[in-house]
Each structure stands twice: as C-alpha cells, then as structure tokens.
UniProtKB/Swiss-Prot annotation:
Family: Belongs to the NhaA Na(+)/H(+) (TC 2.A.33) antiporter family.
Protein name: Na(+)/H(+) antiporter NhaA
UniProt-listed GO biological process terms: regulation of pH
Source organism of the structure: Francisella tularensis subsp. mediasiatica (strain FSC147)
HAMAP family to which the protein is assigned, alphabetical: NhaA
Keyword vocabulary terms for this entry: Antiport, Cell inner membrane, Cell membrane, Ion transport, Membrane, Sodium, Sodium transport, Transmembrane, Transmembrane helix, Transport
Length: 383
C-alpha cells in the first residue's frame, strides 16, 4: 500500500467516524426533524409501471451500498486473480479464521437473545468494517508490518463474501421470480460481453449492471447482490490499469471512502436519546451485539490463528507474535457500517434500531480502542 493510499485510508476513517458522530449530534438537536426527512422524503426512479419509489434512507442503503459492494467485488476479483487469494496456501487459514469470526459472535448473540422477535439479528455482530479497520491500521503506521495488514485485509475479504451470502440468503423478505430472471439475463449479458465478445468499454457494464440492479431491487433480493455479481462480470487484465475492472476500482475508491461510506454512516448511525434510558445498554439485543463484536470476534479469529500457528499450519503467522495476532483479532471486531447495515435489514422497530446502533457503536469502539492499545503500546517488537 503506497503512502497516498495510507493517507486516504486514514482520512477516510476519520471522516467516517466524524459522520457517525455528526449524525448522533444532529438527531439529538433542534435539527432532528430535518434528520428524520431521510425516512419521509420519497424519490421515484423509472417510467410508467417500472418504477422504484423509496425514501432517501432506502436509496442510500439500496443504491449507494450496491456501489460499495460493486467496489468490494472488484477488490475480491483482483485478489483472486493476481493477489493474495491467488495462492491456495494464503487462503485456508484466513478463510477459517473469518468463518470462526463470523460463527462465534453469532453464537454469543443467540446465547443471550432467546426472544423470537430479535433472533433475526444474529448476523449483526458477525461483520467487520474494513474501512474503519484500515483507518486504524494507517494510524498505527509502521507498528503494523505490511504482511500483518495483508492478513487483516484477507480476513476482511472473506468476511465480506460471507456478509454478501448472509444478506442474500437470510434477509430476502419477498421474491419476484420474473424480476429475478430479468436481472439474471442482464448478468448473463455481461458475461457474454466479457467472455465471448471481449468488450472492454466500462460504460457497457455500467449500463447492464444498472439494469441488473434495478431488476434485483424489484425482485426482493437485496441490491448489494447485484453490485457484487456485476463486479465479477467486469473484465480484468493484469498490469493494465485501463482494463474496465482496474479503471472502475481506482475510480470508485475515493468515492467510497470520502462519500458513500460517510453518507451511509450519517444516515444510519443517528441514535436518538429521546425517551431512552441507561437501561437500554443492558437489554439482551444490545449486550448480544456488544459481546459478539468485542468478545466473539477476537475469540473466534485469534483462536484459529494461534492454534494454526502453534501447529505450524500457518506459515505466514510464524513471523508474527501472538500479541500481534491478538491485536488484529481485536480490530476485526469493528463492525460499524456493515453491522449497522445488517441491522437495518433485520429490523424496522425504532426502539430495536436504537438498541442495535448503541450496541454496534459500543462494541466497535471497544474493539478499536483495545486493538489500537495492544498494537501501539503492548507489542514490543512490531517488525
């Protein structure tokens, strides 16, 4: 990662944090009525019977986040073809660690929450916010070696793949087979353009991807799946920055970290303290998310990394101390935007959403704070 990219990740992380803090301030000020307009102002897109009519909040969650998952898909495709995921030896341990980091928080959440009304939130503490995590890694600088950062990114990539699968499978509330079939046809059209006609114009994939996204929303499947699958259909050529995948990834990167994620954070992190008592911190759903992110994530990921290192099944891990592995395991508990995203898909009750937001913020802050402390002050020989 070059110096400019490190600066972008650091600045992006600070903007993301500031956007979330601003949302909380605005929603607990005289401007709260304007903040509420995110859910009351509707915007229509389409013609005649082919119309999507959603409020601003849904456009952010269904539209902007689809672009974010398009970017994630482009990153994953590059890593599979020429990056760390191109070597099987680099895949196994991070993949298992990511799975453990998904399973353990979910189990902790379910062990605390037995009410059928809140069980649907089991996936909320399973996510990792790679943007925030990279921001803290950038803040740590040389205290975190390049290979250790690469390990964090690889775990986060598998975490993102799991999140996409979870959203598609568990948070699809209704299904229109006609719209889904039409969306699939647009995906197939992109594959044909890429593999058969060898079309390298980015605009072709943008247009076809837009129609795939439109049909996916109409089908009831969450639009993020369209963003991800579109990315996998876009041509990638090694060492060619002008290939559509490389061009789109580079073009989207600043928009993702400086606009899309901060806007999402502002729209979804606005906890309203009106009518909320301190006891909300001790409600099962809040505790399940806090302990899932702060305890479950570190326990699941670190246990796999440490055991595999001890058994010499993890060659990359031999160059790291257990404290370093523990530090990055803590950082993976920063769920923030991804956890909030799953939360708004799982519930629409205002009280539950406030409990979710508090749980996500507290769990993420604890994970980020202690992860930073371990890697900055406790690890004695970072190199």
């Amino acid at each position: 990662m070059c110096a400019s990219q490190k600066n972008q990740e650091l600045i992006g992380g600070l903007i993301l944090f500031s956007a979330a803090l601003l949302a909380i301030v605005v929603n607990n000020s005289p401007l709260a009525s304007y903040y509420a307009m995110l859910e009351t102002i509707n915007v229509k897109l389409g013609i005649e019977n082919l119309v999507i009519d959603k409020n601003l909040m849904h456009w952010i969650n269904d539209g902007l986040m689809a672009i974010y998952f398009l970017y994630i898909g482009l990153e994953i495709k590059r890593e599979i073809i020429v990056g760390t995921l191109s070597k099987p030896s680099n895949i196994i341990t991070p993949a298992i660690a990511a799975f453990a980091g998904l399973a353990m928080p979910s189990l902790i959440y379910l062990s605390i929450n037995h009410d059928i009304k809140v069980i649907n939130g089991w996936a909320i503490p399973s996510a990792t916010d790679i943007a925030f995590t990279l921001g803290i890694l950038a803040l740590l600088g040389t205290r975190v070696p390049a290979k250790l950062k690469l390990l964090v990114i690889t775990i986060a990539i598998f975490d993102d793949i799991a999140a996409i699968a979870i959203i598609a499978i568990f948070y699809t509330k209704s299904l229109s087979l006609l719209s889904l079939s039409l969306g699939t046809l647009f995906i197939l059209a992109m594959i044909i353009c890429n593999r058969i006609f060898k079309i390298n114009r980015s605009s072709v994939y943008v247009v076809l991807g837009f129609f795939a996204w439109f049909c996916t929303i109409k089908s009831g499947v969450h639009a993020t799946l369209a963003g991800f699958t579109t990315a996998l259909c876009i041509p990638f050529r090694e060492n060619d920055k002008d290939s559509p995948a490389n061009f789109m990834e580079d073009s989207l990167h600043p928009w993702i970290i400086y606009f899309i994620l901060p806007v999402f954070a502002f729209a979804n992190a606005g906890i309203s303290f009106s009518g909320i008592s301190f006891s909300i911190l001790f409600e099962p759903i809040t505790l399940g998310i806090i302990w899932g992110l702060f305890v479950g994530k570190q326990l699941g990921i670190f246990s796999i990394l440490a055991v595999f290192k001890k058994l010499k099944w993890f060659k990359l891990g031999e160059s790291f101390s257990n404290l370093q592995l523990y530090g990055i395991s803590l950082l993976c508990g920063i769920g923030f935007t991804m956890s909030l995203f799953i939360g708004v898909l799982a519930f629409n009750d205002t009280h539950l959403l406030n409990a979710i937001k508090i749980g996500v913020v507290v769990g993420s802050v604890l994970s980020g704070f202690f992860g930073y402390i371990v890697l900055r002050f406790i690890v004695t020989n970072p190199s």
